[in-house]
């Protein structure tokens, strides 16, 4: 079996481009969800608000400007084939790409070197890197910038198994209720169910990488996604909290096996600017 060589410089170049693209161009599925919401929204103020969000997207894409002033933490996901060898340091390559991308596009630097001493690193590094080993020789990079307004509204709980699916529904709806207008709705929810405390949180983040027009492959969870989406939109919070039928654009659930005595649930809240961009090197 042959090994494919990937130069670390190629990874740096890809990450640089993806940081810029993710911050200036919304993924087609999220943009389509916004367009669909605008077409279906019956409340005049909500419809007007959605129209302003659409206009903002167009200006950002046309002028290569950030969609939002919070250009986020650089969350980088790499699907790395087991038959790939990287010539160079992967972590350094990713961080250099983030550094260049945020500098080149004049994106806001939002990372502190220490969570309590609060000294800004000045270049939006370090990136938050997750590597998934997969079969083959693929090297797929996804950059998903994540802003603090929605991240701060995210929650995790350790339910009792007896709480069951109703406990999951209640926790998700309570999370949205507590968040209110803070995460700049219409929101997107990444939900992790199962695993361990740490794996569940990572699973919720991973769920945000799935296109909104691709429901869970398991019909049971696909139905739960739809049920939660309808319930959240029935709250009437609406775009930016001004009221309306569009509080949420999509719910994406990912699930894992778990301990017989556990039922972890994590909700990673994302704003209407759910950013991600991918490339293979």
Model-derived regions: residue spans:
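Non-transmembrane, aqueous-exposed alpha-helical and coiled segments at domain scale
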Residues: 1-281
């Amino acid at each position: 079996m042959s090994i494919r060589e990937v130069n670390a410089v190629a990874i740096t170049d890809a990450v640089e481009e993806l940081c810029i693209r993710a911050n200036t161009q919304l993924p087609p599925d999220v943009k389509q969800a916004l367009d669909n919401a605008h077409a279906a929204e019956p409340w005049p103020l909500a419809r007007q608000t959605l129209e302003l969000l659409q206009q903002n997207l167009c200006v950002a894409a046309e002028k290569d400007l950030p969609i939002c002033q919070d250009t986020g933490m650089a969350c980088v996901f790499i699907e790395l084939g087991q038959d790939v060898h990287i010539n160079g340091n992967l972590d350094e390559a990713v961080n250099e790409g983030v550094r260049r991308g945020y500098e080149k596009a004049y994106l806001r630097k939002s990372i502190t070197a220490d969570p309590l001493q609060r000294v800004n690193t000045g270049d939006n590094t370090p990136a938050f890197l997750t590597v998934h080993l997969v079969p083959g020789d693929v090297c797929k990079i996804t950059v998903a910038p994540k802003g603090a307004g929605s991240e701060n509204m995210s929650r995790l709980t350790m339910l009792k198994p007896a709480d069951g699916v109703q406990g999951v529904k209640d926790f998700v709806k309570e999370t949205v209720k507590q968040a209110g207008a803070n995460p700049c709705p219409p929101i997107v929810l990444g939900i992790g169910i199962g695993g361990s405390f740490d794996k569940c949180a990572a699973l919720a983040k991973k769920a945000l990488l799935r296109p909104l027009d691709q429901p869970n492959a398991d019909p049971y969870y696909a139905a739960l996604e739809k049920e939660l989406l309808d319930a959240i939109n029935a709250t009437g919070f609406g775009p930016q909290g001004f009221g309306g039928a569009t509080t949420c654009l999509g719910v994406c659930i990912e699930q894992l096996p778990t301990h017989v005595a556990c039922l972890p649930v994590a909700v990673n809240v994302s704003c209407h600017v759910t950013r991600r961009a991918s490339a293979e090197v």
